[in-house]
Every structure is written in structure tokens, then in C-alpha cells.
Amino acid sequence: MVVTDSPLAPHKYVRRISKDFSTVRRYSNTPAVVVGSFRASTSAFIAAESAAHLPTCSSPTTRTPVSTPRGIRRRQRMRKRSSVSSTLSKVLILNVRDLLKAHAGSEPLKEHQPRSWIETNFQKRECIKFIPCPKDDTKCCCGQAQITHQTIPGIESGSPGDLWLPTKHTRPQPTDAYGTIEFQGGAHPTKAQYVRLSFDTRPELLVQLFTKEWNLELPKLLITVQGGKANFDLQAKLKKEIRKGLLKAAKTTGAWIFTGGTNTGVTKQVGDALLLEGQQRTGRVVSIGIAPWGIVERNHELLGHNREVPCHSISSPRSKLAVLNNRHAYFLLVDNGTQAKYGAELILRRKLEKFISNLKLHPFTHSSTPVVCLVIEGGTNTIRAVLEYVTDSPPVPVVVCDGSGRAADLLAFVHKYASDGEEQPVLESMRDYLIGTIQKTFEVGLDQSEKLYQELLQCTRNKNLITVFRIQEKPEGEAQELDQTILTALFKSQHLSPPEQLSLALTWNRVDIARSEIFVYGQEWPNGALDEAMMQALEHDRIDFVKLLLENGVSMKKFLTIPRLEELYNTKHGPANTLGYILRDVRPHIPKGYIYTLHDIGLVINKLMGGAYRSYYTRRKFRPIYAKVMNSYANACRKSSTYQYQRYAGANSLSLVTGLLPFTSEMALFEFPFNELLIWAVLTKRQQMALLMWTHGEEALAKSLVSCKLYKAMAHEAAEDDLDTEIYEELRSYAKEFESKGNKLLDFSYRQDAEKAQRLLTCELHSWSNQSCLSLAVAANHRALLAHPCSQVILADLWMGGLRTRKNTNFKVILGLAMPFYIRQLDFKSKEELQQMPQTEEEHLENQNLDNDDSDRSQPDAEALLADTYSVRDTKVHENGKVSLTDSDTAQFREFFNLSEYNEVKQHQPLRLKKKFYEFYTAPITKFWADSIAYMFFLIMFSFTVLVKMEQMPRWQEWYSIAYITTLGFEKVREIISSEPVAITHKFSVWAWNMWNPCDGAAIILFVIGLAFRFRENTMDIGRVIYCVDSIYWYLRILNILGVNKYLGPLVTMMGKMVKNMIYFVVLLAVVLMSFGVSRQAILYPNKQPTWSLIKEVTFQPYFMLYGEVFAGDIDPPCGEDPSQPGCVTGHWVTPITMSMYLLIANILLINLLIAVFNNIFNEVNSVSHQVWMFQRFTVVMEYQQKPVLPPPFIALCHFYSLLKYCVRKAKGLEVQRDNGLKLFLEKDDLERLYDFEEECVEGFFHEQEIILNQSTDERVKNTTERVETMSQKIEDINQKENIQTATVQNIEFRLRKMEESSEQILSHLAVIHRFMSTHTAGADDLRGSTINIPGEMQRMRTISISDTEGGSGPGGNGGGGGGGGAIVPLGLGAGLNLNSLQVTTRRRFNRSLTEVRPDAYIFDEGTHFEVVPLPEEPDEVVKSREALNEQVVRKASMQSEADSDIYIPVSQRPSTCETVKRTPYVTVRQDTGASTESKDTLTPMGNNDDDQTLVGGDNSDDATPDINFEAARHRALRQRTVSLCRRNSETYSLTGADINRSHISLNQLASLSRRQMSLTQSEPDSDKDAPIAQGSAHPGKSVLHAKPSRNILLKLHSEYTSITDELESVCHMIASPTVSLPSNKASLDRPKTEMSRAEAAALLEKKHLKECEENDYMILEGLIESRGSIDASAQGFEIGVSIDYSHRYPLRRETAVELSPSKPSVDGDLMGGGEGGGAGGGDSSDTSGAGSCGAMVGISSGFQLKNERPWQRNSSMEQQTYPSPLVPTRATSDFLNPPYEGRLFKKSSESLQKNSSTETDYSAHPYRFIKQSSNETNTSLTGSYNVDTPSLTAEPSLDAGDSHSATGISISVGAVGGTATARYQPIRTASVGAADGRRLREESSSSLDLSSSGPVTMQAAPAPPVRPMLLKKQFSVDQGKPSQTAAEAVPQTPEAAQAGQAKLISTLKPQPFASKLGMNVLKESSSSTDESVGSSAKSSNPALSIPQISTHLVQDEIAKLSSNIKSSTESEKDPPFNETMC
């Protein structure tokens, strides 16, 4: 019997399961209540389980004896535990979701009452009906499994065929997921807001969510990013540009970025761009990810209300879900009830974008929020999204990042070549290639690729809406960046007026866009159009825009009016400032919302500048002007309701004046607008704007000083208002900046012109309260400027006055004072020099002797002069030039001061004696010494008075002292009255600015008090004591006199500073002194009575202890029990201890601290002692300049004279107050010249500063760093290209070795074929045996045109023959012709047009260079040795490694001349050895192979042999996709082939490292030699090789990137050059999964899934476009079937490889339309690698069948049929060497053809070939090989793409006019012929050969590149069912017939079973057996081959005419332009 271990065992399982459940709860925020309920239910379940399996125990401690063995009991117990645990685990798994849902549903009801705004307005969606998915019955169409699907009572499950719709089968519920996501993984978590919402949420709710809940500002630009969902990598340079440009565009414009939100594809790239921004919260870019809720990984963790969810952004590649990108700030998780399905967010995102685009940027503007789409990479859904954007109303501009891949590259290319009209000639000519590219790029089928092609065309119909961004390195300057491209695209797409564009640019703050796109040449702006923009730029502090507007015609003088300036002061934009704080000081009771007036601003300026300054806004003149202007501008500039409230309060009092004052528009303007704007910028703390205004306008030096003073005063106010310390420091730094600029400007001006610089300092400033720069510098405490030599020269000049003495000046002045007659001996300045000195107005007028005329020039009333003089500043300077009391008009006397008059006076006019005395006594130095002498005499007299006994009546010494001090008091009163401010308090504050003045006043008042006591008998002694005390100050006042001295002045300043600092120290000392003094006094004298003497007793002894007096007896007085001694007080022993501590602290610590402070003060002042003294000197000069002439006490006479003068002026009605400040009065013209000099100095100063900045170390380091980064990038590119070049060379060498082995076997087969043909061909002596026909390895056609003189005439050409004038018959390899009489001529390659844009010729992508150098050849020599043959084949094989070769055969037109055009088929490869990576492989053609001959019967003239040229192989050879696809073919290859494939794979890994953009080059002609021809030889001989130097083609290194656009352009621009395949990861993706790494397999799995998601979005967008009119509908985009069948999708590649499958039988088929099957291979009509035949094709079907594999191993394809063993791999012709033709029309070629053709002409869209088609052609046929330009060398060994091989046909063409036959020789591309047509081809070829004797024969050999079926339809009439004989009968007979005997011999000697070997490749598995080939050729596998038919009547005419052009250009030794020579 088995018992449980414990009756509590079931609870163990409960605890264990509950622990697991707690883990789930931790991530799902499930409360403990749910856990408790779950534990309870689980406990009940366990109890039931336990009851079923276990017996009930009697007691907890009782155990039933065990009757079974111990081991059995243990096993049963474990089995029981396992059963219970598994059962409970199942319960947990099944019920945890229901518990979470129950909690989520009940939580809002319990804890969120009422619900939040988000829950009220946003909903989620849940599927309520189970509809089985067609692919999986256990899953619903919504994506949920059946076991977890919600079931609603009353709703039955649907059937598998039902259509699931989110609107019908889901129900909305309040959202249960919103809050904050904290992305973990970094140093600090990145937070993002999220919300789950329904797919049909209204966009206005979303905008409210952004603005109200998430506190976002509305965007000024919306950038919606579209791209691929699958992960992709951007090229490094492009990635850097995209990241930088996107971030800059978003941050500078305040844009929002919309993305997909998930961490895949393009959203991941955007997230990486946002990563550069950093973690800052403020100013973070608003990036909003809109993702489907159902695809979010672990979305159950997001459930909760306003939660903070920790999240790790780590995705699982095997999961179909995705994680959110951790760089986004906001997420909208769109829910439509589906799980793991994309597409839910598309409709919502588009509706939201459309809604935002309709929002206004500003409340009062008409411009809406611009939206732009940025396309990066992308899939099929991206193309459809772009289509939806550009066709929407209003359309959305699209910016495409070219080079990012896939959809973006295709859009960029199609956009580039799209035309505005309906016709798209270039794109239509490339239609098939584009469709193929789409198939490969998106891995879709043909139907869908054609649909995507049409959508691309529809996108480009709105070409102006699409802008392509591509990195371009322009030598002339910087390329346009992505942010500029985005903003420019908006201007291009939205047809906005220039003001609207300027407003947008201002909103974005992008002055570069405004400069490049708006202010362009030719843009005219009406008057005032830019004023609003200027106002907006000033308000928003847009410095660059203000500068730009000033540059483009905005006149600030006309712009700035009084209302606008007041509006600027009241703007809410811009930085925070302290203007409001200061304004509350001048206007204490300001209501809320008060609008500042200019009068208020004037009061603030006056407060900040000090009493010396009066703002123009506070002048009486300004008040009526302000009132009149504001009344006039009230309706225009202000709202009437607010304007009436904020009007200036004094305007009503001036209503009469305002009404009478005439209003003019000029009244509202300012004379110096930049000055007003400078003050506005300073007061509102806009430093950069202030600096801009400082650089503009006049009076720059004065503006810098005013700004410095304002900033310092504002800093002082900020410190007093206890504002942040940062504000104080910021304002101080701004003040220092202006202080420095002013000083440097003065220094620069002084170096330019010292005299004018001095004038700048002393001239009167009308705009700044009539002050001078010197007085402003003193007010700003600008010591450096006053210490400048320019200022010191002025001060020295002012100090000396009219004197001019150099030595012993003081002695001479004292001597002059003592002996007045000595004054005549002193030197004085001339009258001219005196007039140029600064002076007061009074002196100026007196010097002009104009006082007697003052009555005639009384000042008019203010009202009469308002309109003219309102801008004249009448304020006078204060103490440093301040004396005036009231306003005055300075214009009345300024007209009398004309410097030009004084220039006419003699330069050295001496002064009169009277003037000398006046100048001597009024000089400041004279006044100083007179005052000093008088003061010293006063001190002597006053000292005598206090030292001797004071009598009842004062002595004369005392009377003198009384008189001196009394008159000094009157002088101080005069100084107060003469100060500028009107208010007495302001006057006193100005006077008290100098600290000696208040001290003088206190001493005088004290003396007067003592004097009052002195004259009373009983208090005379008190008066005497006051005298004695007062004498202390009068002695100390000597320091003021000593301050003038250069050495003593700084020391006096130090003393003053030390006294200030000592006051703080005294406070500390008093604290320590009182603490110990009170303690000592209280202990020693406990019984003291309260008296005032206690204060003295407390402080007396401790204070004097500081100076060494210890008072030892008092510290510890003797005491004891001895009666002679006083008793000891309690605690008497404490006193010595405390006093010892006191002396330690006070005497040592505090005194030394004071010494250290004084030492610090000395060091500070001593370092600037020179500046301090110079600054003090200015104060002394100004003080003595304004003093009266006589010193006290004689100064009373001067006071009496001034009073009398004042009364006289007042009686006469004259203005008595004059400005006594020292200034220079200049005429207006002189002032303008001075301002011009100052402006020039400002410009020179900035230029000098710029030079200094560029030469500074920091700037040089910065420039060096940028250059090093650029060089590093280029070196990295060079290194990368060098590595790839090295890998390419190694790969080529490996392939060449393999080709050598293959060539040996090929040559052995050739020898067998040659012997066989020699045996079976009659007339061997007449026919020349040749190796020109290399069977099977050359995709060429050879036509033999035989004139009637050479052979007999015959009937018309067969149906296999070409055209109405001749027949084209296939010529067998063994056909016997009399070729000895044919001349072999070399072909000459002509140069391309200089205007042609094409890739680098001769250069592989990896950098390997090849060059084709033709050499003379001997065609009759025979290759006698195997080694020679091997060498030829090696050269021939190496030629195949080239990318392509353009071969052109210039032929002259001769009717009866035999010409043989021959090209050397073999080339030898010579690789230059050396260490350089730029070594090139030189390809030297090896002669003596009659391959690709064009034979024409005629005369054997040797002079008709032009040169032969080869176009060297060019273009990129081995791209990533090119080599990667080779892996698929390697499975069936032999060991040799596998080695080659391995080389490809190894190369792929290196080739994928670099991508390059094609450069623009042009080929150069070679100087080729004529090839001599030897006749009579039956076998070709061994050619002689002539080494020729290779051309030096420079390797151009590119730092650009490549894209699909490059590859498409290569097709569009190349001359039959191959198209490099698209780069892809096929090499890694097509490998078996066992060979992949784990990361590769995961990436493959993820990419596959994400591409399916792109297709799903593509289908949803289709519904969106169809329902364009109802975009606001709820879910039209979702009304799509759930299951989408992708079975029709084709793989990415177009597979046309050939697989040898002898076991598979082939099926015979009839000939179909040639246009349809010309390019068919293996039954696939889209196959572009198939080979066709020109003329009647002879198909061979040796049991081989086409397989849909892509051929890429063309270069080694000669091994395919050489080996008879089955192990020999099959090769297929590659698109690499035989690409489709380029789709580009050339206008010149078209015109040249039209000149020589009839009207019935139809030209093909082929870029270089225009075939004229006759209107009467009926039954002609021609194969698909019609292209003139061949992409590969004609004589290269290669196989077809099809089972049938390249045909060698004979085309018999008979001239239709005049009986002369004209022959054209050109390589012709052949269409692919399938093996299924073998039988039919043999019949056609035999019939063609039978009719060959009736006409001239033209032999052509051409390769077999792919052909476009669509173009064949357009160019040829296709004959599908008529027999070929009808075409031959329709050919008219010409009198000159060809040799019929030879032609019949060709047809009769050729046996029917052997026809396949004559027309096609005879390299079969056994070349000796003809019976095998007969059997195998009877098989066919292509049932749908059609041969197009064309008439050659007009074709030959046009070809003949064009060939004459070629001939003429060839004879003139000039290569003809390509565009004019294409046939």
C-alpha cells in the first residue's frame, strides 16, 4: 500500500505552481488577488486529485506501515508526483490567459473609476467569431489558435470558406494597454509613450492625444518614412548621409517622423539615425512609430493602465512577431483583432497623415502642415504606397534615396528616364529588362512584375512630386544633403507663392533653403512683401533670416516703425528675459496682461543707464509724436480693444497738441533704426541679434558701450532680485563680450587713423542722449577703453587745456600762478587746435562771439519743431560731461560751426594776450594747482585755529577757514543743481556717484554744527571739539588730491578697496570680541550695577589686546583668603583660559586673515593699477574741467558772476542752461564722414577677426581633423578596391588555367571535325578548310553574300532565307565555297560619341584592366601544332572573361567587289607583372582563324581591307549576384566545374565588399594595322604574334556607391555591354541550411517572413488606392480575403541554365511566332539568355533539356560537350556576356536614317538599331537575331542557353534595284532556339540550302544574345503558318545571279540527317559518329518557337547608305560618332 509522504503534499505543488505563476504576474502586472484565487482553485483541484489517487490519512503524524519494498514505494510516489504536477501545469497554461483577461477587464471597473481620457476615447479590438483559416483549421483567420480564441455565446464558428473582416467579426472594447515603455539595455532606460487603439480611431482624437496627453507641439513638418520591412544593410556612406540628413531635417524644422515602429527594415535604420541624437529629453525628435498590435512581441506585457513597462528590444528571428524600436519616443499600436498579421496600421496611418496635412501651421496663416514621404529601400508595398501618395489629393511629395536598394532604386531609375508625356520611349525600350529586374528584385512572378512596372510608370507621371537623393561628390562644392533634398521637394511639389515659401522656411528656420530656393536670381518682391517676414524673423530670433532679408532689399529704416517696435517689446517669442522684473521697479502696479509702451521702455533704459542718460522715449518731444502715430496706426497695427488699453497714459493730456500736429509717415520712423533694435535685443536678452544689430548702422563704438552698460545694470538687477545665478553670469558674459568688441574696434580705428579715432571718442552722440563715447565708457566702467592710448591722449590734451608744454609743466603752472606776467612766456596752442579740442557748448558759443545774437535765435516752440527735430536728442552729459538741466535745441548754434571755414585760416595763428590769460586760468591743470594751493593754505589756517586757544572772537585765520568751508559748500550745491536729471533725487544720486562728494558734504555739515556751538559762550568748547574732529577728514581729503599722481593714485584706490573689505572683517572681529569680552566681564565683576560704562568695560580690554596690550594683571587678579587680598570670585580661574583662547583666535587667526585679504586686494589692484589710475584720471579731469576758475574762498566771485549771468539771460528770455560736457561739435557732413570711417573700421575689424580665427590653433585643428577624415575615407575606399582587384586577378588566373584544360579538348574535337568535313565535302580544292566554325561554342551567324558574277542565279530565296531580295541559308561547316577569291578584311572598332554616358570601358568591377590590341594575321597559315591551338583557345577563352565587347564592322559599298570582312577570333592575355594593383591584362587578338567572316564574291583587290579593331571588354564583371548564383549550378558539375564554382564563391565573398558607381569615360581608337591575306591555303596556319604595348587606362577610384539604378543605367547607356546582375545574398541564401551559420539561417527565416508581410501590405494598399474617394471609410483597406496565395510568384532570378538530361525525351513542336519565341528557352518566354538563329535555324536536340537555372559560368562553358563522359557538366550561356539590348533611342541615328528612307518606315525602339520595314512585305521570315551590336566577342567559345546551339546560317540577299547586290556585314544577335524545334529547323535549313544557288549569298556569324519578344512584334511581321517556300518564290530574280553550282553543291552534299551538325554546334558526345547525332537531333523540347520575318529590300538600302558614312569616316582616320553610325 502506497501512502503520501505528508498530508500537505498537494500544497507543495500549489506552492510550486504559484511560484511559476508569480513569475508570469511579474511581467503581466497581475495583482496578488488573482494569484490567490488561482491558488484556491488549484488547491481544490489538487485535493480532488489526491482523493482520487491517495487514501485519507488518519492523522497528520500517522504513517501507514509499508508492506511493499522500498524501491517500489519510491517509484510509485514519484509517479504520483509527476502525474499531479503535469496536470497542474496544464491547468496553469490553460487558465493563466483567462485570469489575465479577467483581471484586465475588472481592473478599470474597480480601480479606474472614472475612466481616464485615453480609456474613454480609445478602444481595442477582439475577434468574436472563429473562422478557420484555409491553411490551418486549428487557427482562426485572425491568427489566434482555437484553444485560446474567445467564444461568445450565440455566435457560432464559421466555415473555412468564409471571409473574415475586422469590422464584422471583432468588437470594440475600451483599451487596456497604455502607459510608458522603459527600454532597457543602456546606461539609462529610454522611455516611450504607447497606447493600444482601434484601427478605425478618428485622427482628431490622435492629434488631441499628442497635444493634450503627451504635451507635444503640432509639427511644422511631417516626414513619413516608407521602406522595406525586411532587414537590409545600407552602404556605409549612404547610411551616414541618411542618418545625418534625417536627424537634421527633423531637429531644425520641428518635424514629426512617422515610421512602422518595429525594429525591422527601414524603421530600424531610422532608429539608428535617432541614436545619434543622444538621450536628452528636451528637444528630442518626435518619432512616432505606428505598428500593428498583433505583431508586437510579448504584447501581453504591455497590458495595463498608465503603466511603466520595462522592455528589452531583443527580437527572435524564428518568431513571426517583431519588437518595438527602442529609439522611438511614441508608439501607436493599432489593433484590428488580428494576431501576427501586418497591415492593421496602414489605413490609420494614412488617415492621420492626411488629417495633419490639413492643419494650419499658424493660426493666422493659410499654409498647412507640409507632409513629405521618404523612401528608403522598400518592397512591393513601398511602390504602391508611393503611388498612393503621388496620386492622392492633395498629393504628397516623395523623396527617394537612390542606392538604398530595391524599390527606391527602381523608382529612382524610372524617375530619371520618365518623360512628361504619355509616351515613354526609353522606358518602353527597356520594358522587358525592367520587368526582369523587378522579378529578380522582389522575387515575384511575371504577371505581378508587369503590374509593378505599370505602377512605376504611374508614379513617374507625377514627376515633379518625386525627388531623388543621391550622394554625389561635386568638385565645385558640397553636394546637396538629405535634409535639403527633403525641404526642396516640398517647394517643388507645392506650388506656393514666394511669400508662402518664405514663411515655411522661416517656420523651419532653414535659411539655406530660403537662400537656394526662394531668393533666386530674377525673383522680384513687391514693396513691403518682405516686411512681415522680417517681423517674424525678429520675433522668433532668426538671426540668419534677418541677415538674409537685409541682404535682399529690406530697408530697416522703412521697416521699423513705432508700432512695430512696440510690438517687438511685447512679443511672447524669444528667450526668457528680465525686462518684466525691471519694469515692475519703474511701474510698481502693473496689471496682468499689461502691454508695454515705449515710454515704459524709456523709463527702464534711464534706470539702467543711470542718471546721466535720458532715453528718447521719455523726452517731451517724443510724447506727441508717439500719441499721433499710435492713433493713426491703431486700426492697422493693433486690435482696437487692446490698443485703447495699452495706449500711453500721457497721450490724452496732449490731445490738443496731437490734434494740431500734422501727421506724416516719416514721423513713425527712426533716424537710426539699428540703434533702437540693439536696445530691444539687449533688453530682451537676444545676444546674437544684438551683435547683428551692432554690426549694422552707424555709431558702432557707442552702441557697444551702451550695450555693455545695459547688460551690467541688468546683471546687477538680477543679482538684487535673487534670480538664478546663471542669469547673472550670462548677462555679465554678454557685457564682457561687448566690452571686448568695443575696445578692439577702438584699437583698430586708432591704428588706421589716430585723429579720427579721437574724434570718435569725443564727438557728440545725438542718438545717445548727446553724450560722448568717453562719458559712456565711464558710465559703463570700461577701464580698458579709458586706458587705451587714444583715450589717454585726449585726457592729456584736456588736462593741459590751451597750454602746450612738454617739460616741467607743473613748475611752470605754479610759477604762472605766482607771477602772472610769466604767462606770456608759456607756449599755447593755436586757435585752430583749440577749436578741434573737446569743449562745452558755452565755450563753443563764446569762442564764436555769438552771445550777442542769442536774442535773435531764441528756440522755437516744441510743437513747431516736432516734425523736423523729433529725433534730435537734447540730453546733456552728466558729471563726466554732464551739466545741462533741460532740453535744448542744438541746431540753432550748430550752423555757425563750420570746419571748412577754419581750414581757410592760417594753421598757426597765435593767440592774443587776453586769450592766453583766459586759456591759462581755465585749463584743468591750472585749476588743480590753484585749488590744491588754496586747500593747503586752508589746512594750515584750520590747524592753527584748532591748535591754539580759541578766543571769544575768531581770528582772521579762523575767518578764512570758515569762508573756505562755506564757499566749498556752495560749490557742492552748484554741482548738485548743475547735474542733468530733473528730479532732485536723481540729481543727488548722480552727485553722490563720487564717494568724496558725500564725505565733503558730511564734513561741511559737521563744521557748520561746530560753528554754531562755537559762537555760543557756554558751548564754545563743544564747538572747538567738533572743529578738532572735523579736521581729521580735511587732512584725509588730501588723498583726493594725491590721486592725480601716477604712483600715488593706485595706492589711494587700494586703500579705498581695503577699507570696504575691512568693514566685513570688523563684523567678524566684533563677534569674537563680544563673545569673550562679555564672558570675562561677567565672571570678574558679578556684582556690577547697570551703567553705560559696561559697554566700554566689555570691549575696551579685549579690543586693545589685539594690538599687544595684554592687561595681564586684570586677566588674573590676585585673590585669596588673605585679608590683604580681595576674595576670589567663583570661577575666577576660567578667565585666563577664555582670554587665552580669545587671543589665539583674534590676534592670530583674524588678524592674519585680514592681512591675507588685504594682500589679495593689493595683488588685484596692482595688476590693473595702471588702468585704475587712468580711469581715475578721467574723473579728475572732468571734475576740474567743470570747476570755476577761482578756488575757495574766492570761488564766491565766480558764483556771483554765474548767478548774475543767469538772471540776465532769464530776463532776456534766453535758454540759460547749456551742456558743459566736453564734446566735439561737428557739422553734419563732417559727422557723416566720421561715420563712414567708423563703418570702414567695423568691416576691417571683422575681416581681421576672421583672419585671426582662421589662424587660431582650434580652427586649424578642426580643419586638419576634417581633412584627415576625408583622406581616411578615401584611403579606405582605395584599400577596399585594391583587395577586390587582387581577388579578381587571382580568380581570373584560376579560371584561365581551367580554360587551358578545356581548350585542349576543344581543339581535339576541332581536329576531328576538320577531318570529318574534309572527307565529306566535295570540291575540297575549291573550298578552303578553316577552323572558323567552332561548333557549338560560338553564338554567331555568318552570312555569305555571293554576287552574280561569282555564281549562277537561282530561284528566289527559301522561307528560311531572309527577305524579298535574297535568301539567307545556313551554311554548314563543311560547305564548299570558292573562298580563295574572297578577301578577308579586318574589322575596325569606331569610337563612341563623346556625349555618350556609359560605364568604364575595359575595367572590371574589381579593377582588372583588359585591352584588345589587334595584330596582323595570316589567314592561310595552318595551325600545325597542338600547342599553338591550345594557345589560341586560351586567348579565346580569356576573351570570354571580359564583361563585353562591342564589335562593329565598317563596310564600304561596292556592287561587284569581293570583300571579306574578317575579325581575329582569338586573343592572348598578357598580364603586366608588377606590384601595382592597377596592372591590366592586355588582350592581343591572334589571327589566322576565319571565324566570323563575311564573304562577298568579287574582285580580289587588296586595297579594300580596312583595319580590324576590337572594343575591349568593359563594365563590371563579377558582382555579388553574378557569382553567388553559381552555387546552384555546382551540384551537377564535374570536379573541374566544381573547382571553378568554388573560385566564384570565394570571389563572391570579396566582391560583395565593394560597390562602385560607373564613371564617364570614352574609348580611344587603336592604331591598327592591315592584316595581310595569303591565298591558296586549304588549312589555316599558325598566326604570328606581335607584342604590342597596352594602353594606359587609369583606374578611377570611386567613393560613391552603386545601386540598382546603376545597373539599369548600364543597360540604358551601354553599347551592347553586359548588365551586371543585382547584388543579393543569393550565395548565402541558396546554400543548404546545413552549410549556413545559425545567424544566417535566422536572418533567412526572418527575411522570408517579412517579405510576405510586404506582400500583404501591398495588397492592402491596393484596396486603399481603389477606395481613394472614401479614405475616411472605416475599413475598406481591410476588406480583403485573409489567405493570399503567393503561388504565382516567381523566384528572384530568371533561370535559363541548360542541364544535360539525356534521359528525358524531347517533344517535337511546330514553329510559332518568332516574336514570341525568339527569346524563349526551355519553354519560358521571358528567358533572355536563349539563342536564336538568323535565317533558318538548324536545331539540334541531343536528348538535352532546358532547366530553369541561371547561367553564370559562361567563361568556362567550353567544357560542356567536350567530354563524352556523363560526368562532364553542362554550361549555359550567361546574361553576363549576352545581355538584353539597351533601351535608349538616339536622336541622331533616327535623323540620319530618316534622311535616306521612305515614309513607310518603322524604327524599332532599340537604341542603336533602326530596321526599316517595307509596307509590302508579306511572306518574309527572319529569326530573332537582329541586333547590330553584339555584347561579346564573335569568336568566343560558348554554349547557348537552350538545348539548341548557336547556328551558323547562310543568308542570301539579292539587291532589288539595279540588279546589284549590296552586302552589309554586321554581327547579329540570335534568338534562343529550343531543342523542340530541331526537326523543323533541319527542314528549314535544308530547304534554304537547296535554294542558295539562286541568289547571292551573304555569310554572317553572330552570337546569340537574348532578344525582347515585345520588340519583335513591333518591328517585324510574323508569319506563323506559311511554308517557307513562299518567301523564296516571292524573291525576284536578278540578272546577276550567284554561282548556282557551288550553292547546289552545298545543299546536295549535305545529308539530311547531318543537317543539325551543319547549322549548329557539332560538339556532341561523340564527334565521330553521325548516327548518334541523327538520333539525338530528332528530339525536341521547345514547342513554341516562332521566327519573325522581315523584308530586306529597304533594309539593305539603308544599310548601304549608312555604311558609306562609316567608310568615309574611316578613311578620314576619324572614328565616327556612335550615334550616327548605328545600323
Swiss-Prot record:
Keywords, in A-Z order: Ion channel, Ion transport, Membrane, Phosphoprotein, Transmembrane, Transmembrane helix, Transport
Outcome of swapping residue 1917 to G: In RNA edited version
Extracellular topological domain residue ranges: 675-927, 1014-1024, 1079-1136
Basic residues bias locations: 71-81
GO biological process: intracellular zinc ion homeostasis; magnesium ion homeostasis; metal ion transport; monoatomic cation transmembrane transport; protein tetramerization
Subcellular localization: Membrane
Sequence segments annotated as region (Disordered): 56-81, 833-858, 1346-1365, 1471-1507, 1556-1585, 1698-1734, 1751-1770, 1814-1844, 1874-1904, 1919-1939, 1962-1990, 2003-2023
Feature: compositional bias, Low complexity: 56-70, 1725-1734, 1886-1895, 1966-1977
Entry GO CC: cation channel complex; plasma membrane
GO molecular function: inorganic cation transmembrane transporter activity; intracellularly phosphatidylinositol-3,5-bisphosphate-gated monatomic cation channel activity; monoatomic cation channel activity; zinc ion transmembrane transporter activity
Topology of this chain in the membrane: Multi-pass membrane protein
KW Glycoprotein (keyword) present: no
Similarity comment text for this entry: Belongs to the transient receptor (TC 1.A.4) family. LTrpC subfamily.
Family annotation (PANTHER family): TRANSIENT RECEPTOR POTENTIAL CATION CHANNEL TRPM, TRANSIENT RECEPTOR POTENTIAL CATION CHANNEL, SUBFAMILY M, MEMBER 6
Record-given protein name: Transient receptor potential cation channel trpm
